[in-house]
Amino acid sequence: MALNLLSIPPSYHGLIIQRIPLKTGLVPAEPLKTLAPSKSKLNTIEAKRIMSVLDEAINKVELITLMSYLESHPEALEDALPENFVEAIREHLDIGQALVEKASILQRKQKELEKGEEAEEDWDQERLLSIELHKTNLWPLTHQFRDSTKTILRLLINEPQLTRLLHTQAPGRSPGAQCLLTSLVELRGFLFEKLLTSPMEVREKNQFIQDISRRSKRNQEIIDALQAELAEVLKNKEAEVEKENFVIQELKNHLHQVFKFSENSLLRTKQEAEKQQKVDYRASQARQAKTQQDILALRAQYHNLVMENREAEQALRKKKYKVETEIENWIQKYDMEMNEKQEEYEDLETIHKEEKLQLEELKERHAVLVEEFSQIRAESEINSKKRVEAEREMVRMVRAATLIQAMWKGYLVRSMLRSRKKKRVKSKGKDKGKGKEKPKEEKGKEKKAKGKGKGKK
């Protein structure tokens, strides 16, 4: 009774844990496919906060259920843990040990009190007072145990490395702790589905459930009717089976009578068969004597045939010997001819090999000559190309020389014509100067014009 009042975590059974494989993953409960919500994410802040609080609670429960490994094996991770964490674990272990001892004492006293109640009707006031005193002393220890658990949990949350180390080192959880985790994960899935479901979807879900219940009710009525029909059919079947059993019994009686009749007929048949066997034996004795006489006659005939065939066999043996000797002679002759042919073939093969070697040498020489011919041909082509190019260059040079000579001759002719023209202009100017005198400005302009004309020419 007193232990039921205490809120001790489910993973501590006398500080000993039954090791099972770790299952820390959050597996949401699978909803019905036909009733799945339309949304896949939470939209409201309140719903997100509710889910975050539940996820944090699941994470804390996972860490608390793994703390039993630290309590049962404090020396396993003592080197890897900081000093404040080790001190908190030791304090937690001391408080837990004291709590378990006092709880066991309280439980023992309650059992003694129950035994006393069965023996006597008067209650022992002193025992009741001691039990109440133990309960009052147990409550502070319970609160201290909770506070130390919260402290260790806070240290684990603040140190992710310690959490990972604990996950890797801890071998498992107790069945109760694993069941609690599984229930929390299922609760998370149910709550997540509940938060995703809108009022319209809830009404649709209720309508769907009502439809299913009505359908189930109709199916149950159909099943009841079918069961009643089945019972009626079974009754009729049993009646038919009884009739068939009666017919089978009558057939068995008839079969028994037939069996007795067949035994009598079999006995009569056996007696008749014995009589017939005696008659057949006598007839077979007579046939056997006749067959013996036939055998003797056939033996004499066989002896005569053997004597006749022996002479024919000797003649055939002689003929066979003669044929075998002829065959041996032919074989020897064939072997001699084959040996001669073999020698001739070997000679031809040696000649063929020599000619083959000569052919290889000739092929090599031919390849060398072909290569030399190709080189000579390439050189001749290059020389012919160079010759053609030189001829073309000579033609270009001749054309250029003739063009230069023609240009030079033209230049000389033009220069001669220009000098003659200047002389004519000067003579004309002298004649005009005698008649009229031009102003100085016009003379300057004429000089400039003449200078421009010379520049253009």
UniProtKB/Swiss-Prot annotation:
<feature type="coiled-coil region">
    <location>
        <begin position="292"/>
        <end position="381"/>
    </location>
</feature>
<feature type="domain" description="IQ">
    <location>
        <begin position="397"/>
        <end position="426"/>
    </location>
</feature>
<feature type="compositionally biased region" description="Basic and acidic residues">
    <location>
        <begin position="428"/>
        <end position="445"/>
    </location>
</feature>
<feature type="coiled-coil region">
    <location>
        <begin position="101"/>
        <end position="127"/>
    </location>
</feature>
<keyword id="KW-0175">Coiled coil</keyword>
<keyword id="KW-0969">Cilium</keyword>
<dbReference type="GO" id="GO:0031514">
    <property type="term" value="C:motile cilium"/>
</dbReference>
<dbReference type="InterPro" id="IPR042815">
    <property type="entry name" value="DRC10"/>
</dbReference>
<dbReference type="Pfam" id="PF00612">
    <property type="entry name" value="IQ"/>
</dbReference>
<dbReference type="GO" id="GO:0005737">
    <property type="term" value="C:cytoplasm"/>
</dbReference>
<keyword id="KW-0206">Cytoskeleton</keyword>
<dbReference type="GO" id="GO:0036064">
    <property type="term" value="C:ciliary basal body"/>
</dbReference>
<keyword id="KW-0966">Cell projection</keyword>
<protein>
    <recommendedName>
        <fullName>Dynein regulatory complex protein 10</fullName>
    </recommendedName>
</protein>
<comment type="function">
    <text>Component of the nexin-dynein regulatory complex (N-DRC), a key regulator of ciliary/flagellar motility which maintains the alignment and integrity of the distal axoneme and regulates microtubule sliding in motile axonemes.</text>
</comment>
<feature type="coiled-coil region">
    <location>
        <begin position="209"/>
        <end position="258"/>
    </location>
</feature>
<dbReference type="InterPro" id="IPR000048">
    <property type="entry name" value="IQ_motif_EF-hand-BS"/>
</dbReference>
<comment type="subunit">
    <text>Component of the nexin-dynein regulatory complex (N-DRC). Interacts with CFAP52.</text>
</comment>
<comment type="similarity">
    <text>Belongs to the DRC10 family.</text>
</comment>
<keyword id="KW-0282">Flagellum</keyword>
<keyword id="KW-0963">Cytoplasm</keyword>
<feature type="compositionally biased region" description="Basic residues">
    <location>
        <begin position="446"/>
        <end position="457"/>
    </location>
</feature>
<feature type="region of interest" description="Disordered">
    <location>
        <begin position="419"/>
        <end position="457"/>
    </location>
</feature>
